[in-house]
């Protein structure tokens, strides 16, 4: 194939700015799909992606387009996720491209994640050109948004394409711009194979399918390939492209994007960002710029029915096949039994994994409160990391604790600035700067502790700003903090699954709110139930669920007071004995209460 006729591009956009719909229009216009096969958001294969209107996994599709100059070009669209948790997926997809379409909603303007992804694209030396989407909306202000793009991102936007993916306006102009503005890939077909593995997933019939972008050389069916980070060798059983269904081709050459099926059994061997080369004719060095992704948020997942433990293990292993950024290891809890401690990139990632477990595998799960990775500095100089409150050592042997901080960029309309600043201060934030991007839009930059973000920050930010805020964050460093472990005791017994690590200043309020919430959720027993929050041996809050009372005097119509007293004493003794041996059933809502308690 003539390498000068290939264009590899991706679409960069904030959530809800119309990226997947635009991809649909490009598929339709180039004839990759007939109207009958068309379903909205074609590239979002998971139901979950379509329902939430977000793109989770990277997808690719090859489009054939005959341009105005009479030549037929091969356009490889590499669809990227737009959410902050999936930044690594975005960086891999972008590394496989030469250019990108920056899609901005003409009514909303530049949002926080648009910025983050554009900077990633510019770091990868991509040629980026702007497209203003949704120009059919009455609220669209193309001139203001063009000005915003130039001011904030610094990309020339005077000739930005005006489009409406929903109405199909501007599709041809976008395809022409792709051909004219995005450079053709460079690469020597005769050189040894050097290909970037930018996504992989597991197919139950064919094993691991890997998506590759060839930078040099060629690859055909039957070639022996090697993955350079693990040095494992495989035979390429099938090579092909997505157009948009899988189509086998005789060979892939430099500049092309396609899939390889090589009988790989484990996705952990097909690391995203790895370099694929030929076993007997290797390239000199790996492609650079890739890192192992580390989970930032941890949470315990336990089956409500303990018989589902093995099913949960299998389900997690299957999800891990498709998601190299997700980790899990077994753990046990006195209150919840056997389960797994899982690591996620962020909150959305956690919700999605959880929802997929329940939806695709039919599991009923209890989730413990999310935590982040803390560093413990012991008196003897040892330093180690902990992921849950149960791993936290006694304070006597600990010199100090450190927690991760993030740098948050929050874009909000200026009417809501006061509320957002109050929220950030409440979450122990340190203000860096406030920038007026336009007279009506403000960018607020704050340093915030990650553990304040993981619980309910995003929900509260959205409710304060009526849904208009957008948030993007990057990790800064670990900082020393006055952190304590707060335990919840039910009738004097610590419930390990409800323990939390939090800042000492917040502990009293948090404890008080949590026990009052628990009081509402725990049903009344035949005996009194004491719910306490404690730091060490000091009780900081308490609520009592009163016992149900049977009227033992009902059958005494008169008679002596001593008779009544005897019956009451007998009841009291019985309740006391019951309290010693009685167990309290904690409903699933009790564990969710931790996530939902607002720091008022």
UniProtKB/Swiss-Prot annotation:
<feature type="domain" description="tr-type G">
    <location>
        <begin position="4"/>
        <end position="186"/>
    </location>
</feature>
<keyword id="KW-0547">Nucleotide-binding</keyword>
<dbReference type="InterPro" id="IPR038363">
    <property type="entry name" value="LepA_C_sf"/>
</dbReference>
<dbReference type="InterPro" id="IPR027417">
    <property type="entry name" value="P-loop_NTPase"/>
</dbReference>
<keyword id="KW-0997">Cell inner membrane</keyword>
<keyword id="KW-0648">Protein biosynthesis</keyword>
<keyword id="KW-0472">Membrane</keyword>
<dbReference type="InterPro" id="IPR013842">
    <property type="entry name" value="LepA_CTD"/>
</dbReference>
<keyword id="KW-0378">Hydrolase</keyword>
<dbReference type="GO" id="GO:0003924">
    <property type="term" value="F:GTPase activity"/>
</dbReference>
<dbReference type="InterPro" id="IPR005225">
    <property type="entry name" value="Small_GTP-bd"/>
</dbReference>
<dbReference type="Pfam" id="PF00679">
    <property type="entry name" value="EFG_C"/>
</dbReference>
<dbReference type="InterPro" id="IPR035647">
    <property type="entry name" value="EFG_III/V"/>
</dbReference>
<dbReference type="GO" id="GO:0005525">
    <property type="term" value="F:GTP binding"/>
</dbReference>
<dbReference type="GO" id="GO:0005886">
    <property type="term" value="C:plasma membrane"/>
</dbReference>
<comment type="function">
    <text>Required for accurate and efficient protein synthesis under certain stress conditions. May act as a fidelity factor of the translation reaction, by catalyzing a one-codon backward translocation of tRNAs on improperly translocated ribosomes. Back-translocation proceeds from a post-translocation (POST) complex to a pre-translocation (PRE) complex, thus giving elongation factor G a second chance to translocate the tRNAs correctly. Binds to ribosomes in a GTP-dependent manner.</text>
</comment>
<dbReference type="GO" id="GO:0003746">
    <property type="term" value="F:translation elongation factor activity"/>
</dbReference>
<feature type="binding site">
    <location>
        <begin position="16"/>
        <end position="21"/>
    </location>
    <ligand>
        <name>GTP</name>
    </ligand>
</feature>
<protein>
    <recommendedName>
        <fullName>Elongation factor 4</fullName>
        <ecNumber>3.6.5.n1</ecNumber>
    </recommendedName>
</protein>
<comment type="similarity">
    <text>Belongs to the TRAFAC class translation factor GTPase superfamily. Classic translation factor GTPase family. LepA subfamily.</text>
</comment>
<dbReference type="InterPro" id="IPR000640">
    <property type="entry name" value="EFG_V-like"/>
</dbReference>
<dbReference type="GO" id="GO:0045727">
    <property type="term" value="P:positive regulation of translation"/>
</dbReference>
<dbReference type="InterPro" id="IPR000795">
    <property type="entry name" value="T_Tr_GTP-bd_dom"/>
</dbReference>
<dbReference type="InterPro" id="IPR009000">
    <property type="entry name" value="Transl_B-barrel_sf"/>
</dbReference>
<dbReference type="InterPro" id="IPR004161">
    <property type="entry name" value="EFTu-like_2"/>
</dbReference>
<dbReference type="Pfam" id="PF03144">
    <property type="entry name" value="GTP_EFTU_D2"/>
</dbReference>
<feature type="binding site">
    <location>
        <begin position="133"/>
        <end position="136"/>
    </location>
    <ligand>
        <name>GTP</name>
    </ligand>
</feature>
<dbReference type="GO" id="GO:0043022">
    <property type="term" value="F:ribosome binding"/>
</dbReference>
<dbReference type="InterPro" id="IPR035654">
    <property type="entry name" value="LepA_IV"/>
</dbReference>
<keyword id="KW-1003">Cell membrane</keyword>
<keyword id="KW-0342">GTP-binding</keyword>
<dbReference type="InterPro" id="IPR031157">
    <property type="entry name" value="G_TR_CS"/>
</dbReference>
<dbReference type="Pfam" id="PF06421">
    <property type="entry name" value="LepA_C"/>
</dbReference>
<dbReference type="Pfam" id="PF00009">
    <property type="entry name" value="GTP_EFTU"/>
</dbReference>
<dbReference type="InterPro" id="IPR006297">
    <property type="entry name" value="EF-4"/>
</dbReference>
């Amino acid at each position: 194939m003539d390498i000068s006729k290939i264009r590899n591009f991706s679409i960069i956009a904030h959530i809800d700015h119309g990226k997947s719909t635009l991809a649909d229009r490009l598929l339709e216009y180039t004839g990759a799909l007939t109207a009958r096969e068309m379903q909205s958001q074609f590239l979002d294969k998971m139901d979950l992606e379509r329902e939430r209107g977000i793109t989770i996994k990277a997808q690719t599709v090859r489009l054939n387009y005959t341009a105005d100059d009479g030549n037929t070009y091969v356009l490889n669209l590499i669809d990227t996720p737009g959410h902050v948790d999936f930044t690594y997926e975005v960086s891999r997809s972008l590394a496989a491209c030469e250019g990108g379409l920056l899609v901005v909603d003409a009514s909303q303007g530049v949002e926080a994640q648009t910025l983050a992804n554009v900077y990633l694209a510019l770091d990868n030396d991509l040629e980026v050109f702007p497209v203003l989407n949704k120009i059919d909306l009455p609220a669209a202000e193309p001139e203001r948004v063009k000005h915003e793009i130039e001011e904030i991102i610094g990309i020339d936007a005077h000739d930005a394409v005006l489009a409406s993916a929903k109405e199909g306006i501007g599709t041809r102009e976008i395809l022409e711009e792709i051909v004219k503005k995005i450079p053709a890939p460079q690469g020597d077909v005769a050189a040894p194979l050097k290909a970037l593995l930018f996504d992989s997933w597991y197919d139950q019939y064919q094993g691991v399918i890997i998506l590759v972008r060839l930078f040099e050389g060629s690859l055909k069916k039957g070639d022996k390939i090697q993955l350079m980070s693990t040095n494992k060798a495989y035979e390429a059983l099938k090579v092909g492209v997505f157009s948009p269904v899988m189509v086998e081709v005789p060979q892939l050459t430099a500049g092309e994007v396609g899939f390889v099926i090589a009988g790989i059994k484990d996705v952990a061997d097909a690391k995203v960002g790895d370099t694929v080369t030929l076993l007997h004719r290797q390239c000199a060095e790996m492609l650079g710029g890739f890192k192992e992704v580390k989970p930032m948020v941890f949470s315990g997942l336990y089956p409500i029915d303990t018989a589902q433990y093995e099913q949960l293990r299998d389900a997690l292993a299957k999800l891990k096949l498709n998601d190299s950024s997700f980790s899990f290891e077994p753990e046990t809890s006195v209150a919840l039994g056997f389960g797994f401690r899982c690591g996620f990139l962020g909150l959305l990632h956690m919700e999605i994994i959880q929802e997929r477990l329940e939806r695709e595998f039919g599991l009923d799960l209890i989730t413990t409160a999310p935590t982040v990775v803390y560093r413990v500095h012991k008196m003897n100089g040892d330093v180690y990391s902990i992921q849950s409150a149960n791993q936290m050592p006694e304070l006597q042997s600990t010199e100090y604790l450190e927690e991760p901080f993030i740098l948050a960029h929050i874009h909000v309309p200026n009417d809501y600035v006061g509320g957002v600043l109050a929220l950030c201060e409440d979450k122990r934030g340190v203000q860096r700067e406030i920038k007026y991007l336009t007279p009506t839009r403000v960018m607020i930059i704050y340093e915030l502790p990650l553990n304040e973000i993981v619980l309910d920050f995003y929900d509260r930010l959205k409710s304060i700003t009526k849904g208009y805020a957008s948030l993007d964050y990057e990790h800064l460093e670990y900082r020393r903090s006055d952190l304590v472990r707060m335990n919840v005791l039910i009738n004097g017994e610590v419930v390990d699954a409800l323990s939390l690590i939090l800042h000492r200043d917040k502990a009293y309020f948090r404890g008080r709110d949590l026990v009052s919430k628990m009081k509402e959720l725990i049903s009344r027993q035949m005996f009194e139930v004491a719910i306490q929050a404690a730091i060490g041996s000091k009780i900081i809050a308490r609520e009592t669920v009163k016992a149900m009372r049977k009227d033992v005097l009902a059958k005494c119509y008169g008679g002596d007071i001593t008779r009544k007293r005897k019956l009451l004493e007998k009841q009291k003794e019985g309740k006391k004995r019951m309290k010693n041996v009685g167990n309290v059933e904690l409903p699933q809502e009790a564990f969710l209460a931790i996530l939902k308690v607002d720091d008022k």
